[in-house]
Amino acid sequence: MPGLTISILQQPLVWMDGPANLRHFDRQLEDITGRDVIVLPEMFTTGFAMEAAKQSMPQEEVVAWMHAKAQQTNALIAGSAALQTERGPVNRFLLVEPEGKVHFYDKRHLFRMADEHHHYEAGNERVVFEWRGWRILPLVCYDQI
């Protein structure tokens, strides 16, 4: 089985400004080709903030942007965002395929030293899916298997 080529992107995030952060990532993604997976930072739309879900972009907008980038790069685009959901605010790791299929995982082990557990609902299930012949188990910073 061929290996996966993975790129991990990092940048100083504009605090609590989703559109500005997406513009920065647009520029970073312009010339990336030949990758299987591109990973964005935790809470890539807002920065790691406890109140981020209250000011976050709607999930549909984040997924639409990720889908466009997945199509542009022909890669799985992955990154977490603070989102409001029917269960309350979550730190949701989204993984979007070029064809539009969306996988998601809600962070299970919240970072207590930053009081993340007081601001976000913990996920309650492991997610495993296949991408280009590889089984992928998404995790977010501080998650433990």
Task: Indicate where each model-derived feature is located.
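Extreme N-terminal starter segment of soluble prokaryotic enzymes
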Residues: 1-8
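Short loop/turn motifs at secondary-structure junctions
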Residues: 5, 33-34, 135
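Short catalytic-loop micro-motif centered on adjacent basic/acidic residues
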Residues: 8, 78, 136-139
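N-terminal phosphate-binding loop and adjacent alpha-helix
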Residues: 10-28
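Hydrophobic pocket-lining residues within nucleotide cofactor-binding pockets
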Residues: 11-14, 44, 110, 144
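Cys-nucleophile CN-hydrolase/nitrilase-fold catalytic domain and related Cys-dependent amidase chemistry
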Residues: 18, 27-98, 103
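Active-site catalytic loop in hydrolytic enzyme cores
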Residues: 84-145
